[in-house]
Amino acid sequence: MGLQMTAARPIAALSLLVLSLLTWTHPTIVDAAHPPEIIRKPQNQGVRVGGVASFYCAARGDPPPSIVWRKNGKKVSGTQSRYTVLEQPGGISILRIEPVRAGRDDAPYECVAENGVGDAVSADATLTIYEGDKTPAGFPVITQGPGTRVIEVGHTVLMTCKAIGNPTPNIYWIKNQTKVDMSNPRYSLKDGFLQIENSREEDQGKYECVAENSMGTEHSKATNLYVKVRRVPPTFSRPPETISEVMLGSNLNLSCIAVGSPMPHVKWMKGSEDLTPENEMPIGRNVLQLINIQESANYTCIAASTLGQIDSVSVVKVQSLPTAPTDVQISEVTATSVRLEWSYKGPEDLQYYVIQYKPKNANQAFSEISGIITMYYVVRALSPYTEYEFYVIAVNNIGRGPPSAPATCTTGETKMESAPRNVQVRTLSSSTMVITWEPPETPNGQVTGYKVYYTTNSNQPEASWNSQMVDNSELTTVSELTPHAIYTVRVQAYTSMGAGPMSTPVQVKAQQGVPSQPSNFRATDIGETAVTLQWTKPTHSSENIVHYELYWNDTYANQAHHKRISNSEAYTLDGLYPDTLYYIWLAARSQRGEGATTPPIPVRTKQYVPGAPPRNITAIATSSTTISLSWLPPPVERSNGRIIYYKVFFVEVGREDDEATTMTLNMTSIVLDELKRWTEYKIWVLAGTSVGDGPRSHPIILRTQEDVPGDPQDVKATPLNSTSIHVSWKPPLEKDRNGIIRGYHIHAQELRDEGKGFLNEPFKFDVVDTLEFNVTGLQPDTKYSIQVAALTRKGDGDRSAAIVVKTPGGVPVRPTVSLKIMEREPIVSIELEWERPAQTYGELRGYRLRWGVKDQALKEEMLSGPQMTKKRFDNLERGVEYEFRVAGSNHIGIGQETVKIFQTPEGTPGGPPSNITIRFQTPDVLCVTWDPPTREHRNGIITRYDVQFHKKIDHGLGSERNMTLRKAVFTNLEENTEYIFRVRAYTKQGAGPFSDKLIVETERDMGRAPMSLQAEATSEQTAEIWWEPVTSRGKLLGYKIFYTMTAVEDLDDWQTKTVGLTESADLVNLEKFAQYAVAIAARFKNGLGRLSEKVTVRIKPEDVPLNLRAHDVSTHSMTLSWSPPIRLTPVNYKISFDAMKVFVDSQGFSQTQIVPKREIILKHYVKTHTINELSPFTTYNVNVSAIPSDYSYRPPTKITVTTQMAAPQPMVKPDFYGVVNGEEILVILPQASEEYGPISHYYLVVVPEDKSNLHKIPDQFLTDDLLPGRNKPERPNAPYIAAKFPQRSIPFTFHLGSGDDYHNFTNRKLEREKRYRIFVRAVVDTPQKHLYTSSPFSEFLSLDMREAPPGERPHRPDPNWPAEPEVSVNRNKDEPEILWVVLPLMVSTFIVSTALIVLCVVKRRRQPCKTPDQAAVTRPLMAADLGAGPTPSDPVDMRRLNFQTPGMISHPPIPISEFANHIERLKSNDNQKFSQEYESIEPGQQFTWDNSNLEHNKSKNRYANVTAYDHSRVQLPAVEGVVGSDYINANYCDGYRKHNAYVATQGPLQETFVDFWRMCWELKTATIVMMTRLEERTRIKCDQYWPTRGTETYGQIFVTITETQELATYSIRTFQLCRQGFNDRREIKQLQFTAWPDHGVPDHPAPFLQFLRRCRALTPPESGPVIVHCSAGVGRTGCYIVIDSMLERMKHEKIIDIYGHVTCLRAQRNYMVQTEDQYIFIHDAILEAIICGVTEVPARNLHTHLQKLLITEPGETISGMEVEFKKLSNVKMDSSKFVTANLPCNKHKNRLVHILPYESSRVYLTPIHGIEGSDYVNASFIDGYRYRSAYIAAQGPVQDAAEDFWRMLWEHNSTIVVMLTKLKEMGREKCFQYWPHERSVRYQYYVVDPIAEYNMPQYKLREFKVTDARDGSSRTVRQFQFIDWPEQGVPKSGEGFIDFIGQVHKTKEQFGQDGPITVHCSAGVGRSGVFITLSIVLERMQYEGVLDVFQTVRILRSQRPAMVQTEDQYHFCYRAALEYLGSFDNYTN
């Protein structure tokens, strides 16, 4: 304003200034005052009595007037009753009268306004009050008033109001006695209804609607409108990052998001500085942008609303590289190490330090040590006496900082390691020589001098040589030499540490003018017959050298040679023998004479291919499919090296030699198997060295043995008459004859009339040289089945298909025959009587009578006339079956026969046993066998034998044995002694006569047995035995080892192993933890020697290293680790390893590489070792043995380790050969060596010339880029793959550009005027990618190069053909040469005989016997027929009847009442009787497993020794075209009274998933029982064969998982199965028991029994067999089947037959119930089931069950509840279960001396170093219903253990603690207060800070923050203390306690971590047991609808003693469970 004033108007300006001042001091001067004015007058009102009257008055003025109300001239006060005065903005005043009263309120009312300016103004109105019904007509009446409403903020509400009157009343609304302002746009009024939109909190209040017309005014009743507002305090939905690390100068956005209701404002602060302006604070989200950050800072995000404020701090940390360390100091300097120390003054966020060092001034890279976390380090492995410089670098998470200043030092001296170099000697005269040298290369110190040694006799020790000391100069002169003598000179250097090694000897001749010694004499190129020598001429030759003298001798001919050669520095010495060691030396000669020679150097010539084939090749056909082949090596003089392999070729005669099968091996014998039957083979052999194959031997022609033939062809049968049939046939097909057909068998069998089933005994007719035969002696009018079988020498073959033919009728039918006994003694006589046939078909002419012993030739008699109808037979044999046949005859012929069988009574045998045979098993063990007496003398069934055996001189005073077998074994016989043997037989009637005395004489000299036999387990399946060898005297062939788990006398029942001339052997495939007896005998040419003493070994490794593993196996190294032996304390460990591998080299030759054995000795504390310098793809035999303190022998533990494959070795480049037809290029392709792994395939890659490819090498062309693809653009000159060649089929020559396809790659046509390069890529057969080697590029190739030369194309050398013709050397034949003829013959004879013996033994053990007399041995107990239903007899009982083994006889079933005592007897003496009983289990039969051993089935077996018996295996329907598709490693197993109740199988492999599910489908199985986890002890036990989610397809089976339930000890999975082509869906449940420990058996059987009962409950009765598997399908699987079957047996019988059932199972699958521990566990489980019974109750029956428990039954003294609780207490406590708890250092930590945790379930704490017992706390892990170790049951902590209690909670992540006691009860301390009350307290490492305490009606909840002071981490722990448990007894009701349990578990689910809930009372067993029991019982009721309080407590007591301590507590568990059920209708109704 001042800027606009001008000088022309000074007066106006002045006036304005004065006015401004006056305005500031007296503002009224400017603003004029206004008197009051009423702008709204009150209106007259008429109201009902009791209604509401409201007068409104408004006034204005300046200043605003005040309004008062007057009634009848008197002021109305707002404090008066019923009168209210309300003042509102805008000068409005309201007078409200409520309720109005007649006679008191009807009066005039005046509104008076005044403001001190002018006079007061007023306006009045009259209130008229109508009583009752005196209201005027038309008075408004509200017909619908508003009601109370509740809405949420933001919603719309409609307040209703309707009124009537005349005139129509006007309606308006009052809120909180004030008229509603309808100018608010959210308010609207329609037809009297008030609508409020988008409601707000201020809309809440009391509302009235008012109806008004000229007749009066009516108010509605006041009603409330409530507006609900969600009030949520602010929280961060996305708090800012706690810490952000950024680089210096970078940018960062910090986001902070908060929510709440109302939404909070969000702002950022840096310290106390606001970074967000108040007027710009965003709601909900705020992003802070930090730009060019220069410093670390704390930023705080604050979110605030009306309900509070929260904040979160974000640290922005600026990162930078660390500074350099300072003050690097060096100390403790030694010859090979120094200690560095340094300081660091930078920030503390370093990760580690790096030390760099190298010799100072050396031109080499720094060595580096990384990862140092201290500020000192000892640098080792330095070179002695070397100046080093060191740098230290600090490293943080950004990177490395700058290096420190260098620190230098010189390492100390040490003993010298090298000798003086380049020693040179020359003669100055014949008596003086001068010697010069150079200092040692690594003196390791300062050289102080030298000592020169010289002598004329170098064989003397150096101490006897002449010597001369020299200072540190490098030259000296020696005088007074003997002229013409040859001196040897050596030089030795000295340092302060002493003398170093001597130099290499140098020779010189003390003669002036002769040359000195040539130097550097060496062999540079060594061949098979020649060697190239090189040397350096003498340094001092004085005169010119005229020639050299070369000397050599060979170790083959033991001859010395000498040759004079010309003056040069190289020479090739030839004419040598291959593979021979030579010593070669050299001297120079001048005109004066010959100088000193060089030292002899050893040179071995290379090996060469053998010059002769193997000798004495012998072939023997050992069966119809095998040939045994043996040979001797080639003659030694023609081997040309070490023979490392042999190749055997065999081919059928008539086929080409190149079709022969080749076998490579490193032994001199082999059995060729899987040959064709009765087929001629041509066989030849060659030998090979490392160079290649030698010449072939002359072929041998040999035919395999005969076999049984196939079935005859075109069989026809025609009836000739009523008793004869003509049969004709053709021989079997040529391919099926399998030998010379020597005849035929015709089998005729009578059929029943209806054609179903056979009748009477079959007929068999032998036919020799014809193809037709008349079968006679048949019955008329009878159907017969006719079959024909061919015969070879091996027996009769397959029968032809049966032909049914019927003989003609018309002959008499069968007569009725009866038989009666006439006499029994002294002879047997019977009378046969018959009746006339019912139909004779003509005149009956008589009868034919045939009779005799059954299966013998029958006598025949014709009886004429029909009147003869009886016949007497006298003098019949005793004890045999007679057959009598009677038939009538008519004019047609003989009629049908009636057969009558009669068993004659038995008598005593009439003769002795026959065919007595003796055999010495060893010289002192005799085996005698015999047959029963001959049939005519047998007189009945032989029941036993009496055997007498004694020395001849004892005159019958020997032993007598009663035997049921026809075999006796006698041991410990004396040498050169005669023994007498005789035997007699018994029938039921008594004994027969003894046999004649058989005299047996033992050898005169049995020789001594092997001594000092020892055995020791080397693993859980192997053992090693060793012994002192027997003095051979030239006759010893080897040894035979006998071993068995049952040490019977008969060595034929022992397992055997034959070994050669050795002193140790390994026994494999032994039973884990089983006890074996072992003995050994020497093998001589004439048999075995005396048997050694027997030793026993338990297959439990104790003195060998355990858990030998190979880790980190690479191409050139492996790391071994092992554990120490259990018993032995070693002083060292010894590692030894060797290997041999055969591979094909780059020329196609088979090479054998032998890695010699290496040994490594390690200290006893070393448990891991890395072996380096290994070869790729080589299988090493690794042994680790523990060396005891006496250094005696201990066997090693062994593994085989194969190193990784590597890329092939480099190849040569492809070569050009020539252009063919102008279109193709013939190239020669290289082949790669397979030394580092088998080659999978080769690629031939063509690279057209292109600028982009000129500088690339072949390896730069990636295979993926070369492979054709749809999305790859084609470049005109792009490289491509022209061909792919499979393994070993790469051609030597190849036509490039032919246009042909090679394994889906096209050999494209070549273009003219374009150049190409090619290379070959060899790919190793390994899953790893890019493991290949590429050859170099070929030269550039094009079609305009030269044509290919004419003639034969080049070819790769044939590895089967010798490279050079055989060279023969003529030698003088003299007498000693005879030895070279005789000796090989002797050796070959020995080898052949040994091979035959081994072959026989192996064949006897491997091949099942197929002869008829073995049928009873191999016949299964029952055929595997799936369709068979339950049999009337139990399969175990049937086995006891049919196969009475000694074990079954001596182990009968046990009555249930005696079972507990029986187990106690078996467990006595450390389970000795259990061991004996378990080891005696033997099915008494031999079974085959041929299908498992078929080559195509071997990969389907998880373990090689666990196979499926053929007779009981599960046969799947074969898939057409798939060999072996009917096989799965599974067997049917019998249950109780149910055949094939189970299928025992192995854990499925990846390749058997389809077979497994196919088996489930085919068998209609509904239940799979899985007894293993997928992985145990880091070993794969079973592959996951089911889908984790969704559906998986297994072949034609679709498996869908529909439900998974995981419980503490088992899991249940439900699957739906569909099959392709089938409409039905099937449900299968899989129950997996997960509580079986990795090692051994479960500690207690109760969880397993619970699992087993669940399995049975979920298995439908009509389903197929239950499939049970573990890993091998024999151990745990057997346990399940036996226990399940025994539980079923107990329901129906009063006996237990575990022994019988295990025996039965072992006849159906091998190794069932695999260990003794499993066998004992079965007994314990059955005893547990007997003692406890079945206590599981359906939930709906709980009330009835509880009532029964509380009743004392008649005749009983205690109730069922007491009985159950007493059973719980019948658990024997063994002090060995509480080892740690009873230690003296832990006893004070136990509140009660008898409540201690079991060792197996106690809670382990991390031990504190130096504090004994620091790992102990009195607490136990307890399993819940769904989780293992879900709870910790602990005692109330004592004062000494409070710190351990918090340590337990922290280490095991337990964040919920349940306390069920008060600190003191009944005046005694029950628990120490282990928690802080008001402030934080530290318990050892942990700081416990109380957060809050909540007092609930029944419990207290305390929250604590627990912080680990070591790292600052923290977590919240909540403690629930139940305070309603009475100090005595139990709660009256369980309802409160159940609610408490629910609250604890609900909190656990919401806030708890994965750890267990810790529960404690005082002792941690009583109330704690109740809490855990009810938790489990209630949860199980929810899931299964059943409960089992007894078993639940029983299982708890197996984890902690005395759980649920009193009977009251036990009863309370039942009551609480019942109360819980009462809240559910479905259980109570």
Curated annotation (Swiss-Prot):
Q: Which reaction does it catalyse?
A: O-phospho-L-tyrosyl-[protein] + H2O = L-tyrosyl-[protein] + phosphate
Instruction: Please tell me where this protein is predominantly located.
Output: membrane
Membrane-related topology note: Single-pass type I membrane protein
**Which InterPro entries does this one have?**
FN3_dom (IPR003961), FN3_sf (IPR036116), Ig-like_dom (IPR007110), Ig-like_dom_sf (IPR036179), Ig-like_fold (IPR013783), Ig_I-set (IPR013098), Ig_sub (IPR003599), Ig_sub2 (IPR003598)
Which terms does the record give in the GO molecular function aspect?
heparin binding; insulin receptor binding; protein tyrosine phosphatase activity; SAM domain binding; transmembrane receptor protein tyrosine phosphatase activity
Q: Which residues form the Ig-like C2-type domain?
A: 36-128, 140-224, 234-316
Keywords for the protein's UniProt record, in alphabetical order: Cell adhesion, Disulfide bond, Glycoprotein, Heparin-binding, Hydrolase, Immunoglobulin domain, Membrane, Neurogenesis, Phosphoprotein, Protein phosphatase, Receptor, Repeat, Signal, Transmembrane, Transmembrane helix
Write down which residues bear the modification named Phosphothreonine: T1572
Q: Which GO terms describe its biological process?
A: axon extension; axon guidance; axon target recognition; cell adhesion; centripetally migrating follicle cell migration; hematopoietic stem cell homeostasis; motor neuron axon guidance; negative regulation of homophilic cell adhesion
Glycan attachment sites: N176, N253, N298, N553, N616, N666, N721, N774, N915, N962, N1183, N1304
Enumerate the residues binding substrate: D1638, C1670, S1671, A1672, G1673, V1674, G1675, R1676, Q1714
Q: What does this protein do?
A: Possible cell adhesion receptor. It possesses an intrinsic protein tyrosine phosphatase activity (PTPase). It controls motor axon guidance. In the developing eye, has a role in normal axonal targeting of the R7 photoreceptor, where it negatively regulates bdl. Inhibits bdl cell adhesion activity in vitro; this effect is independent of its PTPase function.
According to UniProt, the name of this protein is: Tyrosine-protein phosphatase Lar
Identify the taxonomic lineage of the organism of origin: Eukaryota, Metazoa, Ecdysozoa, Arthropoda, Hexapoda
